[in-house]
Amino acid sequence: MKRPVLLLAALVLAGCGDANRAPVGLQGDAARGRIALAQYGCRACHMIPGVTGSKVYVGRPLEEMAKRPIIAGTLPNNQANLVRWIRDPQAIDPKTAMPVLGVSERDAIDMSAWLLSH
């Protein structure tokens, strides 16, 4: 009788994880990604869940990114492609208004973890 109770308790506690941690399967530190999104000024053009910023948006809102089938108009939506887009959007779409901001690989991974988990 004790085992089912302990198993139930373990399952309940497993669901009480850190909301800033990237979901299973994603690399990176989502909490650091939220900070990096603010530091790189992404909020100047985008509405981002959990990141305060401008009310004038040039780029698309960055909410529910994980539900989008594609990113940047052509890429299958996965973390690797999102990191590529964040780091060098001009290489993917030379006509994009999104600038190359010199985002490091580590920061792009963390930023993608935040975006794909919120």
Predicted ranges, named:
Residues I35, G53-H118:
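Extracytoplasmic electron-transfer domains, predominantly the class I c-type cytochrome c fold
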Residues K2-L7:
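Sec-dependent signal peptide recognition
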Residues G17-A38:
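Electrostatic cytochrome c docking/interface patches
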Residues V12-G15:
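C-terminal motif of bacterial Sec signal peptides marking the signal peptidase cleavage site
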Residues C42-C45:
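Short cysteine clusters
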Residues I48-P49:
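Beta->alpha turn/N-cap motifs
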